[in-house]
Amino acid sequence: MLSPKRTRFRKQHRGRMKGVSYRGNHICFGRYALQALEPAWITSRQIEAGRRAMARYARRGGKIWVRIFPDKPVTLRPAETRMGSGKGSPEYWVSVVKPDRILYEMGGVSETVARAAMELAARKMPIRTKFVIEE
C-alpha cells in the first residue's frame, strides 16, 4: 500500500475538488494511459488493486507507471463514539483526483493488451475513466 514516509502534519482538512486537473494530464512515460473523467478520492488500496490487475494481465511484458500518489490522510472516529473530543485519528490515505488526471501509464505492450489491462484497472476505480493513446 502506498503512503507517505513522513508528513508535516498528521491531519488535513477535507477540501473540495473544483475544476479540472492542469497538472499530470499528459502522457509522460508510456504509450498508453488511463485518464480520470470524474473527481474523486482514490484510496491507496484502490490504486494498488488497479496496479496488480494490470500487472497480472500484462505478465512480464511491458512496464507500468502509477501517476498518482495518496498523500492526503483521511480520519475516522471510532464506532459508537459521542460527538466532540476532537478529530478522529488517521485511518487511510487518499489521492485527490480531478477530471483529466492520468492515473496509470503503460508501455512495451501492444494496444490490445494495454486496452484490456487498463479495462481491468478501470473496474477497480470508483470513477469513470477513458483509455488514452499518446499521439
Curated annotation (Swiss-Prot):
Chief location: plastid
Listed GO MF terms: rRNA binding; structural constituent of ribosome
Gene3D superfamilies according to UniProt: Ribosomal protein L10e/L16
Matches recorded under InterPro entries: Ribosomal_uL16 (IPR047873), Ribosomal_uL16_bact-type (IPR000114), Ribosomal_uL16_CS (IPR020798), Ribosomal_uL16_dom (IPR016180), Ribosomal_uL16_sf (IPR036920)
Superkingdom per UniProt: Eukaryota
Keywords: Chloroplast, Plastid, Ribonucleoprotein, Ribosomal protein
PANTHER family: 50S/60S RIBOSOMAL PROTEIN L16, LARGE RIBOSOMAL SUBUNIT PROTEIN UL16M
Protein known as: Large ribosomal subunit protein uL16c
Organism of this sequence: Nuphar advena
